[in-house]
Curated annotation (Swiss-Prot):
Positions of region (Disordered): 148-202
Stretch forming the signal peptide: none
PANTHER family in the cross-refs: B3 DOMAIN PLANT PROTEIN-RELATED (PTHR31541), TF-B3 DOMAIN-CONTAINING PROTEIN (PTHR31541:SF34)
Gene Ontology, cellular component aspect: nucleus
Protein name, UniProt field: B3 domain-containing protein At5g38490
Residues within the DNA-binding region(s): 260-364
Record localization: Nucleus
UniProt-listed Pfam families: At2g31720-like (PF03754)
Gene3D superfamilies in alphabetical order: DNA-binding pseudobarrel domain
Species of the source: Arabidopsis thaliana
GO molecular function: DNA binding
Taxonomic lineage from the root: Eukaryota, Viridiplantae, Streptophyta, Embryophyta, Tracheophyta
Lineage: superkingdom: Eukaryota
Length: 364
């Protein structure tokens, strides 16, 4: 009997040890699962943070060029869709939290990153963000852009905007006229002619050109855009003002030209962006796929688009040409959404968001 009781007690102790071991194993399993879950969550957060930081670094799609037959069909059917409309996705169709009746509180948090499959279909115009650059390469680039050659065979050899070297002759205050009465005689003759013109009714009206606007106040809505986009802490720059012509709103052209000679300032590009816009001399392709910088344009209605900013050479029959900056690959969408028309006065301001070149389009 005693041996049986001892055996039962021995089994009870073994069962207790087994139960304790199972409990410990279950505890360890739970701890490992929790650690794995925490590790996965941290990796997901880091991946999301990295994705957010790189939200502007994406490739813009190339515009699909339609065939000649399709272009003729579009011209014959003006009610049809434009063949030059941008192939870029409309960034304003993405639902966001700021699309409310109150336009004073916009928010610009919608993603602008495309998946890998779409990236393969896009062109090579991209956002440039490169702080490390070669000083010698930069100097060579700006020397090329400022070259004074009149040959039209190369893009960079066309005449560019150069600082004016004209000087006005300042009269010498110590100069004495050889004829003491010459000044008096001139004044008398002018007065006599003025009296005769008033009597005959043939008074010429002097055309006074309006004074240029030396200082343009930045619109308040640009401050709001920069604040909600977390833009870089720098003052926006007014680079271009223009009254729109027919070519600027032509859907078949789909671009806004900014001649170098008409720019208010031309110091808003980084050296990396200048290199990206420089034409590859060895590239014989007609599309110039390697030229251009991806930018973001925002209008007064707090709408934004991804456009391409590049150098555009306008060649003339005389052999000379002009250099222009141009915004395309989506300009038709900007014209339509902003209700732009011939005669509208526009101004372009530049700022940067996380180092990316952005434009603010203001209309009067």
């Amino acid at each position: 009997m005693s041996s049986i009781m001892y055996h039962d007690n021995h089994l009870t102790d073994s069962g207790k040890n087994m139960s304790s071991g199972l409990s410990l194993l279950a505890y360890v399993t739970v701890m490992v699962a929790e650690e794995e879950e925490q590790r996965s969550r941290l990796l997901a957060e880091k991946r999301e943070e990295s994705k957010c930081k790189m939200s502007f670094f994406y490739l813009f799609p190339r515009k699909i060029k339609s065939s000649l037959a399709k272009r003729r069909y579009t011209q014959q059917n003006p009610n049809g869709a434009s063949t030059c409309s941008s192939s870029l996705p409309d960034l304003n169709l993405i639902p966001t939290d700021f699309e409310t009746d109150n336009l004073q509180n916009p928010c610009f948090d919608e993603p602008m990153v495309c998946d890998e499959e779409q990236r393969l279909k896009k062109g090579k115009s991209k956002i440039v963000y490169d702080e490390d650059y070669d000083d010698e390469s930069e100097k060579k680039l700006f020397d090329n852009l400022n070259g004074a050659s009149t040959s039209s065979s190369s893009l960079l050899n066309l005449p560019c905007l150069e600082p004016s070297t004209e000087t006005k002759d300042v009269p010498n205050p110590n100069y004495q006229s050889s004829s003491p009465s010459s000044c008096l005689t001139g004044k008398t003759n002018r007065k006599r002619r003025a009296v005769e013109q008033r009597k005959s009714g043939k008074v010429k009206k002097v055309k006074v050109s309006p004074l240029p606007r030396l200082c343009t106040e930045m619109p308040e809505w640009i401050f709001q855009v920069m604040r909600y986009m977390n833009a870089d802490a720098e003052t926006p720059r007014l680079i271009f003002e223009r009254t729109l012509f027919k070519s600027d709103v032509n859907s078949n052209l789909s671009r806004l030209l900014m001649p170098f000679q008409k720019l208010i300032r031309n110091d808003f590009l980084t050296p990396a962006e200048c290199r990206a816009m420089q034409k590859d001399e060895d590239n014989d392709e007609e599309d110039d796929e390697n030229i251009g910088v991806g930018t973001v344009l925002v209008n007064q209605r707090f709408q934004k688009w991804g456009l391409r900013f590049k150098i555009w050479a306008m060649e003339k029959d005389s052999g000379h040409g002009t250099l222009n900056y141009t915004l395309n690959w989506g300009w038709n969408d900007v014209v339509k959404s902003s209700s732009l028309k011939v005669g509208d006065k526009i101004s372009l301001w530049t700022f940067r968001c996380r180092g990316v070149l952005c434009f603010a389009l203001d209309t009067e």
